[in-house]
């Protein structure tokens, strides 16, 4: 009896120790706004009048991890409890861990899970609904994702088919309007349901509709959204779907190269896909891929916030719109020591000297060098990079 009591006590202590460490799974949802789509208001559930705070709580329950006691009285890590849909192009979620994610040079830093899979017939395609990842450093230290965002430049970032600063606006529908069924597709019961307009460079794609299908009867407009319109701006990838049947019955969404959520089957260190070649997997995401708004690579020693948005504006017949799904996330090295951030070390070489002054001056003149630290260039922390930062940097050197 005493032996069993001791074993139970040790088990409890080990469980508490595990919980006390930095957790590898997502722990916080800061923001969520889906674009209209067939899974909106069901992933997660939402009804008219729901407050956004309650929606964020439901999203946390769906994609943030936790520990639960299993049948043997042990605390078991649940890191992929459910899934959410981001809807059509632009829908996004902003998440974080209970610690900053450290940029480990040359390594994959974190994973965001989707539900992509490969077709047994088409090896480089199947279900691929790519989402772009952005990261942010909490420069002002207020614990909120209100600092600049940096896109993780995936394989398609520099493609001539990728549109940056793409903007789309969706217009709230009249749910009681007369429906317009698609004469060529009986599954589409209203092909003028939710109107959208955009600044697409393709004249044929400036405007269109989110269709309503016969499989999902609820409203496709996010019920917690305020106002009559929803607007999103970001990078947009080219469409990736093909009707391989030629008659609308079999659609294949082809994988993008790398660097996108819900694009390929995911590498999962806690449940590895031993039956898949690592070359066809989404290995994860590197903070080293971060670029600024002008596409210049930047060095972020760590990040506090992660944002995922649906990167394509595409409709696939009876399958409906292409909508990125998010099913949780993990930090590959949650207990990595936080790097020392030296004030004024704008080029990240560990030393504050005249080369940092030169970098800040060039930054002010619009000449941003590859690999600069976008947080450190604002030496005095006033949110503006100007001559006062040069003065502050010189004072640091002279100390």
Q: Model-predicted segments: where are they?
A:
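Positively charged n-region of N-terminal signal peptides that target proteins for export
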Residues: 1-5
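Acidic, glycine-anchored loop motifs typical of Ca2+
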Residues: 139-148, 166, 177-179, 187, ...
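Short, solvent-exposed secondary-structure capping/transition elements
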Residues: 121-125, 141-152
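A domain-level signal for the mature, folded cores of soluble proteins
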Residues: 21-129, 154-339
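Cellulosome-associated attachment modules in secreted, modular CAZymes
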Residues: 338-399
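Bacterial N-terminal signal peptides
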Residues: 8-15
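Sec/Tat signal peptide C-region and signal peptidase I cleavage site
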Residues: 16-20
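Predominantly extracellular/luminal cell-surface or secreted proteins
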Residues: 134-138
